[in-house]
UniProtKB/Swiss-Prot annotation:
The gene is tra905. This is Transposase for insertion sequence element IS905. Pfam families: Transposase_mut. GO terms for biological process: DNA transposition. Belongs to the transposase mutator family. It comes from Lactococcus lactis subsp. lactis (strain IL1403) (Streptococcus lactis). Required for the transposition of the insertion element. Keywords: DNA recombination, DNA-binding, Transposable element, Transposition. It comes from the Bacteria. NCBIfam families: transpos_IS256. One of its GO terms (molecular function) is transposase activity. InterPro entries: Transposase_mutator.
């Protein structure tokens, strides 16, 4: 007989309120899980020497009431010094639970193992849910994956960003595989992850498949596609969206320049290159590019010839100036990819592709929900102009 069961029998024997018993048990369990989540996030237990000089630490807590079907529980939400910890147990600003299975699914999606969930459920409810049972409950999240891939998208997107990032995945052996990601912004400035494809390496077949899926989900026209210049991708884009203009990421170009010139020249070259994408208009940008190439070609002939032969360097100047800063590079989608990597550090690796997809869709849905409440910088000032670019 577990301690939980013993306490429950004593409660019943004393004819006390059974809801109060479950409320206090749930309160204890939830607070314990919050502390366990912070330990997992930091990577060490309280007072562990591993945490010394780790770059982050515990930083007290704040109180929150949380409404459950058993009554109000008092939670002590732990904080980290860097302010990056967000407990999976509670949605942002959430103050009410919906259902046990929803909590199980949420924990599973965010990386808590089935065994850890099983342990906490046993403490909360007094009977054992095996990891296999938890896993079966969590498979409901697979429906979210299908819904994500099949949902209807807007007909027109002003900007489409394409970029890949790598995450560890087990297929017999563990290796990092490429997540091909498409992120779009509507003329009104609504930003969202539109879709993704998983493959062992970045490849044009996967990009083609992803763009085909986006068309099937309703995207008819795209004004501008921003990429890092993956070989062959420009042709794939032209086949899918022949009217779309294309922009090469100028930050990638800048990094490439830095890697091919002498260290003594690097700072000057990079500073001069910035004048090309910070010009007041297209005419001045073209002149800045010509001056840049003319100055450095005698010393770096092959590098400058490669730059001369690179297409789609200044396409972004054809769009309203209010959004130039957002569309001359893939920085926007790269920021998303960095956040994905940060979030998945806790997970280490994914046991199969289905687990990876469940996790990605959770992250993407959360991202899309947050972005749905915002208008991306600059788009609100030129929405009518951007809309007029479509047929």
């Amino acid at each position: 007989m577990t301690q939980f069961t013993t306490e429950l029998l004593n409660f019943l024997a004393q004819k006390q309120d059974i809801d109060e018993f479950f409320r206090t048990s749930l309160e204890t369990a939830m607070n314990d899980l919050l502390q366990a989540e912070l330990s997992a996030f930091l990577g060490y237990e309280p007072y562990d020497k591993v945490g010394y000089n780790s770059g982050n630490s515990r930083n007290g807590s704040y109180s929150r009431q949380f409404e459950t079907k058993y009554g109000t529980v008092q939670l002590s939400i732990p904080r980290d010094r860097n302010g990056n910890f967000s407990p999976a147990l509670l949605p942002a600003y959430g103050r009410r639970d919906d259902h046990l299975e929803e909590m199980v699914i949420k924990l599973y999606q965010t990386g808590v193992t089935t065994r850890e969930i099983s342990d906490i459920i046993e403490r909360m409810y007094g009977h054992h849910y095996s990891p296999a049972t938890i896993s079966n409950i969590s498979k409901a999240t697979q429906e979210n994956v299908a819904t994500f891939h099949e949902r209807s998208l807007e007909a027109n997107y002003s900007v489409l960003f394409l970029d890949g990032t790598y995450l560890p995945l087990r297929r017999g052996t563990v290796s990092k595989e490429c997540i091909h990601i498409a992120l779009g912004i509507t003329p009104e400035g609504q930003k969202a992850v539109l879709g993704y494809e998983i493959a062992p390496n970045e490849n044009n077949a996967s990009w083609s498949t992803l763009l085909d899926k986006l068309q099937n989900q309703g995207i008819q026209q795209v004004s501008l596609v921003v990429t890092d210049g993956f070989k062959g991708l420009e042709q794939i884009i032209s086949q899918a969206y022949p009217l779309a203009k294309q922009q090469r990421c100028l930050i990638h170009i800048s990094r490439n320049l830095a890697s091919k010139v002498k260290r003594a020249d690097r700072a000057v070259i990079l500073e001069q290159f910035k004048t090309i994408y910070r010009a007041e208009n297209l005419e001045m940008a073209v002149q800045a590019l010509e001056n840049f190439i003319a100055e450095w070609k005698p010393k770096y002939r092959k590098v400058m010839e490669s730059l001369e032969n690179t297409d789609n360097l200044l396409t972004f100047y054809q769009f309203p100036y209010q959004i130039w800063h957002s569309i001359y590079s893939t920085n926007l989608i790269e920021s998303l990819n960095k956040e994905i990597k940060r979030q998945t550090k806790k997970k280490v690796l994914f046991p199969n592709e289905e687990a990876l997809e469940r996790y990605l869709v959770t992250l993407f849905e959360d991202y899309n929900f947050k972005q749905s409440q915002r208008i991306h910088k600059g788009f609100g000032q030129c929405a009518d102009t951007l809309e007029s670019l479509f047929d």
